[in-house]
């Protein structure tokens, strides 16, 4: 069965377009309620319950109400967490023994986008097959439950406080953050009232950024996708380092005291090297976009490295397949399965800091053996219906580039899971060669797509 509505991270789009409307989201909630609840064996008279969390977008209120109506029509109780990070929904769903969790967020996208993604009772993303089953039911008629079986809604008391304590518990008890000055950029997003509390309660002096959401400013020149704001604040405040989350708090990048940026690949390496030194690791999962330098540095640690498809759900699937506990993406999604069931920006940052304290080192020294290959990524818009995979000009351009790079580089062409774009990535030892080849392939795609 093909995927009609779900992309790589749930259902996502522009608010008011075909899928991000109150009507569609109500139908989606109903379909998810019927699908997920049908798999649960509950005691007689007990209704299933699903948690809903959201980020700070103004459209979240509208979509939350629509989801609530859909679940209630399916006979499902709803527990409302309010604005909390995506990983908080995963944690609370599991901790409260609920049947599923739902996040209303478009992650790092601007405020006028939004989306819906689901978590299982175990706090993991739903498998493709289950999402496809929900899609099928979305297009079927809604049959409202009898009045006596309709679901009810209530708010969770101190959902944010419970998650703060969970994050703190992921940091070693023998350490604290006293003496550290940390700039924390919460992207005016879901972690705005949570992130500062976590690091402050662990002892750090916290300089907060992006903690004044107004419904329209999420990810606007702040957060993990705009690290220049974090860098400027770190340098201006002479901080030890800075941490930037994205709008829903599931990804992280960091900046050291000198203003150097550390993306997901670098942070993943810091955690891997520390855990390997303790004999706690067998392998690391990256993605097709992970830098070759990371793969080879992980190999020098004596660890295996596997590449998953892009998307934290696929990283997690590969981790489970291989029985490994650590994986991540260069975008900043890092999954530490000994700490959480999903990617968590705050928890991942704490694992990096713990590694630095254990190794008595800085981010720069922790990454001294990690040499990145120059990488060029170009996003090329695609015309509707264009089949780039069967175009001979594009195939020839890719083959020529791969032949020229040999074993010292690679070429990756990957369609976006959320936008009509083809991502052209070239990587190799020679930066000018990489730039030239990437631009040539991108030009071929543009001309072929016209």
Curated annotation (Swiss-Prot):
It catalyses: alpha-D-glucosamine 1-phosphate = D-glucosamine 6-phosphate. Disulfide bonds: none annotated. Its cofactor is Mg(2+). It comes from the Bacteria. InterPro entries: A-D-PHexomutase_a/b/a-I, A-D-PHexomutase_a/b/a-I/II/III, A-D-PHexomutase_a/b/a-II, A-D-PHexomutase_a/b/a-III, A-D-PHexomutase_C, A-D-PHexomutase_C_sf, A-D-PHexomutase_CS, Alpha-D-phosphohexomutase_SF. It is an enzyme of class 5 (isomerase). One of its GO terms (biological process) is carbohydrate metabolic process. This is Phosphoglucosamine mutase. The gene is glmM.
